[in-house]
């Protein structure tokens, strides 16, 4: 078992994940719950963003990261991330200048996109994933196997919740989200 030693308290453990079809079915839901906020960024902040704009973006990213960590913790689960968890076939975007961004390099250095990992609620890599997903550099989703639930942070500063068990999970998630000012949860239906 490979253990990555830079991130988190318990570190990421490489795992052999077998429930790929179960996960893929969740992405075909006609309606999902979404954790969203009062503010919105499309792909992060602009290259010429002021320090105030960056501060605002990162404070929001931190709120979302804390909510996601709290969901993993409150549900008493570990999250699976990696090559078999994701709506997109690629886990990283393809920008020519990606390697000039520290946030991307920090994630790419520790995350092998050809593997799956089990992470705990307190693993610091969650912060890097949220930042990179919000900035449109990565497309890494979190799967909680006990509840057959996917948490997908998007480049639109929101987290989609895919599940077959909304009745069982949503009230607890609403309580978690409600503890963070400026964030809320809503239901979206797709055509």
Language model features with spans:
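Structured alpha/beta or helical-core interaction and ligand-binding surfaces enriched in interleaved
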Residues: 1-158, 163-191
């Amino acid at each position: 078992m490979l253990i990555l030693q830079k991130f988190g308290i318990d570190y990421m453990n490489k795992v052999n994940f077998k429930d790929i079809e179960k996960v893929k079915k969740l992405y075909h839901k006609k309606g999902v719950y979404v954790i969203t906020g009062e503010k919105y960024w499309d792909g992060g902040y602009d290259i010429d963003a002021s320090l105030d704009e960056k501060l605002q973006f990162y404070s929001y990213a931190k709120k979302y990261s804390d909510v996601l960590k709290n969901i993993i913790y409150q549900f008493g689960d570990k999250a699976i991330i990696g090559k078999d968890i994701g709506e997109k076939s690629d886990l990283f975007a393809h920008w020519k200048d990606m390697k000039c961004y520290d946030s991307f390099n920090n994630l790419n250095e520790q995350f092998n996109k050809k593997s799956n990992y089990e992470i705990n609620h307190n693993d610091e890599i969650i912060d890097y994933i949220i930042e990179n997903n919000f900035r449109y550099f990565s497309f890494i989703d979190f799967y909680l196997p006990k509840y057959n639930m996917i948490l997908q942070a998007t480049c639109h500063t929101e987290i989609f919740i895919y599940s077959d068990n909304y009745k069982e999970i949503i009230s607890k998630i609403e309580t978690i989200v409600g503890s963070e000012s400026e964030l809320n949860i809503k239901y979206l239906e797709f055509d």
